[in-house]
């Protein structure tokens, strides 16, 4: 299970600048297959943790989601999410949930 957490943490800081509409869904489906997890388990978790209604009306999980102290924020791209997150990390804050699956930075 730890490997799944690490995989999703690294996916949360995925090197693309802009998130694609289905990036989180693609990643969750991939790792459900690799680890023989129940179908749609990770997709369900990601929708609950980082779900966002987008312009075309779809409800998707969003990779550039940051949550601190129960206040979730959705960013347009990686750079904005990292800038926001790094400001708090430099101040010593570590209890920050990041990305599709909202993996906690502290752990």
Task: Specify the residue positions occupied by each region the protein language model found.
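Sec-dependent N-terminal signal peptides
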Residues: 3-16
């Amino acid at each position: 299970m730890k490997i799944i957490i690490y995989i999703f943490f690294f996916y949360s800081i995925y090197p693309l600048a802009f998130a694609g509409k289905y990036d989180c869904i693609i990643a969750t489906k991939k790792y459900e297959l690799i680890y023989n997890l129940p179908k749609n388990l990770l997709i369900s978790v990601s929708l609950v943790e980082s779900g966002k209604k987008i312009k075309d009306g779809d409800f998707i999980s969003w990779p550039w989601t940051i949550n601190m102290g129960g206040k979730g924020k959705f960013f347009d791209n990686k750079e904005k999410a990292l800038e926001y997150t790094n400001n708090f990390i430099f101040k010593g804050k570590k209890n920050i949930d990041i990305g599709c699956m909202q993996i906690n930075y502290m752990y």
